[in-house]
């Protein structure tokens, strides 16, 4: 079941002062929200797994075609192959094989989970005016000063969501250990949940409204 909700934000300028207001209208999941968000997180986590772990069974290990010794009369336990899983250098029983860990999730479900997570993060979200014009060249110090003016803590994980990646902004931010920058159309559940605070530009907020509110 989905319900419509409107999130109201104060918009801060580059100097850290309130310059206006912005709204974000979302259709979010009411009853099963946490379940959907969890499924989306598991799906994205699984997609990062290579699934390439591989072991050889006794039939795949090279050699071992000849019986080591005759069946009876030696006093030793019977053996049919030196590649038995009981032997050193033998095959592996029930070992891992290459496989896909991917989980299916419908596009509407995925977007609903993302909107629900955005709603849950609204308390820790800061909307700011577009600031790409302030970066005529890459300069990390400029962004650190802005973070201070916005009363944010660089010791905690920050997610910066912009309309589109500006090269100078990206190069200025990427050197900061606790700050991740992504464009609105590549917003994902893992980045959103991992962040302690979320910074969204005004244009990115409009893009989120347009792209994910289907």
Curated annotation (Swiss-Prot):
Keyword Ribosomal protein: yes
Keyword Transferase: no
Any one GO BP annotation for this protein: translation
Superkingdom field: Eukaryota
Keywords: Chloroplast, Plastid, Ribonucleoprotein, Ribosomal protein, RNA-binding, rRNA-binding
Annotated segments matching region Disordered: 43-80
Biased composition (Basic residues): 64-75
GO MF term set: rRNA binding; structural constituent of ribosome
Locations listed in the record: Plastid, Chloroplast
GO cellular component: chloroplast; ribonucleoprotein complex; ribosome
Role noted for this protein: Probably binds the 23S rRNA.
Similarity section: Belongs to the universal ribosomal protein uL4 family.
Cross-referenced NCBIfam families: rplD_bact
Record-linked PANTHER family: 50S RIBOSOMAL PROTEIN L4, LARGE RIBOSOMAL SUBUNIT PROTEIN UL4C
Subunit description: Part of the 50S ribosomal subunit.
Protein's UniProt name: Large ribosomal subunit protein uL4c
Gene designation: rpl4
């Amino acid at each position: 079941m989905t319900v419509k909700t409107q999130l109201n934000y104060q918009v801060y300028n580059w100097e850290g002062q309130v310059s206006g207001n912005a709204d974000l209208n979302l259709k979010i999941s009411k009853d099963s929200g946490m379940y959907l968000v969890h499924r989306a997180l598991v799906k994205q986590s699984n997609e990062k797994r290579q699934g390439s772990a591989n072991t050889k069974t006794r039939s795949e290990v090279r050699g071992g075609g000849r019986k080591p010794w005759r069946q009876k009369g030696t006093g030793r336990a019977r053996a049919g192959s030196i590649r038995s899983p009981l032997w050193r250098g033998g095959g592996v029983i029930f070992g891992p094989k290459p496989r896909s860990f991917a989980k299916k999730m419908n596009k509407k479900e995925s977007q609903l989970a993302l909107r629900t997570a955005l709603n849950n993060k609204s308390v820790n979200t800061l909307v700011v005016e577009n600031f790409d014009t302030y970066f005529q060249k890459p300069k990390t110090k400029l962004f650190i000063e802005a973070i201070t003016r916005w009363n944010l803590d660089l010791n905690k994980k920050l997610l910066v969501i912009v309309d589109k990646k500006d090269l100078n902004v990206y190069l200025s931010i990427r050197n900061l250990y606790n700050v991740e920058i992504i464009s609105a159309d590549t917003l994902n559940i893992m980045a959103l949940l991992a962040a302690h605070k979320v910074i969204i530009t005004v244009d990115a907020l409009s893009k989120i409204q347009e792209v994910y509110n289907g």
